[in-house]
Amino acid sequence: MLYVELKKDIESLPFLEAIRQIHAENKKEDVLFVHTTLVPTVPGSNELKTKPTQHSYKELMSLGIKPDIFILRSDEVITMDIKKKISLFCDVPVEAIVQSENVELIYEVPLSFRRQGLDDYILHKLDLDLPKPEKDTWKDMVTRFKSAQKLITIGLVGKYVQLHDAYLSVANALMNAAYDAGYKVNLRWIYSAELTEETVCEKLKGYSANSSC
């Protein structure tokens, strides 16, 4: 799997050319292009605009890349009329157009895609014949995560806590471990420079772990 962000700068062009060549050098059932695109609303109304999607499609086509699947991102519900419009102007079947819906947990996104038939369409396009799983372990995991009731407060100490993305993998690991144990995490960010011998006990009050203070 290769992810490439479509931008109008020279840095991304070699990657786009590389995936074009990958498609050209392999059988059609071995390569699949998925285009993720924003479907914005008109300010002051809920009207969805498909022009940005049509424009990005034409940009890709000009580079020799034809998307097989469209994943649409919008805060509003993508109606069948919108899908048909994109299908018409972007030359892709309606069943190849799905919405990335707003969900409570990011782990619900695959379930949302399954409900919309994305998994079956991918199997069809790649000519794969895979057996249905006997047990839906992913759905069971999401149900377990969402049913977590107990709360645990964890402090994450770092030098760059103002930029939460700098510790995103650590934060996600803590949340995943807590979910699996039946807990929800109240994550607090602690700036390491503010921790001194005089302030450490005060700063670390209220956390779930035992303290030596």
Where are these regions (language model features)?
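N-terminal beta1-alpha1 cap of cysteine-dependent amidohydrolase-like domains
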Residues: 1-213
